Amino acid sequence: YGMSSFDKNNVLRVFNLIMRNDDLVVHKEFDNFETHAEGQTRVDFDFYENESMEDVIDIDPSLELKGRNDYIDWGKPVPKGTPLKIIVDRDKSGTVKVFAECCGAKGEFVIVSPGCDRV
């Protein structure tokens, strides 16, 4: 599982948070994400399911987990480069939770893979 973000060359890419070969139960913390624009007041999250073993990949729209409206909004403009904290947990049932925090605002997003309800 990954989420979209801008790389150091200002290109929107997918940054993988959970890799295919990770253990089933996962807890990871990331502090290398930041706001992209000067005066930003929120961050939108687009999640992707893929089998790549690369940390960063090009966006493939067919892999986006559609129908989501995930964001955190802190309501006041912040400088470009303001840190975002991302925490990812996957439990033994396979449920993935992403926690995000910036400027005191927090969000929790549950990712369910398409087709999991038929397993």
Language model regions located:
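Acidic low-complexity intrinsically disordered segments
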Residues: 1-119
